[in-house]
Amino acid sequence: MEQGSLAKKVSQFVEPTIESMGLTLWGVEVTSANRPAVIIYIDSENGVSIDQCAEVSRDVGLMLEVEEVIDSAYVLEVSSPGLERKFFKPEQMSAYVGKKIDIALVFSLEGRKKFKGLLQETDEEGLLLKLEDQEDPIKIEWDRIKKAKLIHEFK
């Protein structure tokens, strides 16, 4: 199964359980490096504790095994999204307007595939990004974005 569709399948399967624990499923990532891994990111308004990550790992891990959602050996990781969180859905970004983000595109825009800048706004079509090296912000459509993450600025 393709990694993107496996991540979606796992997301749909585990989200009700995670929500029943008072948490939010931030996203699911599937990697196939040296050892295949399923990484589940959870969040809440007050952040998440190590104990909450462990509880989700136990409960969700057991469910994934019993229901045989994944048909090969894998490592399960449960984590908070962290300070430099990846964005999995466009609607996650609206809470970070005014913050710096890092974006990688599927294909080039203005001769580049990577952008860093200040997120100025989001809407149903895409986002507006103010780059440090340009006066005018650029509009990037959601379907052009391959990866996006928050850049945490220490003060």
Curated annotation (Swiss-Prot):
Domain of life (superkingdom): Bacteria
Gene3D superfamilies according to UniProt: Ribosome maturation factor RimP, C-terminal domain, RimP-like superfamily, N-terminal
Function (record text): Required for maturation of 30S ribosomal subunits.
InterPro entries, A to Z: Ribosome_maturation_RimP, RimP_C, RimP_C_sf, RimP_N, RimP_N_sf
Homology family: Belongs to the RimP family.
Name of the protein in its database record: Ribosome maturation factor RimP
Keyword Cytoplasm carried by entry: yes
The entry's keywords: Cytoplasm, Ribosome biogenesis
Any single GO CC term annotated in Swiss-Prot or TrEMBL for this entry: cytosol
Protein localization: Cytoplasm
Any one of the GO BP annotations: translation
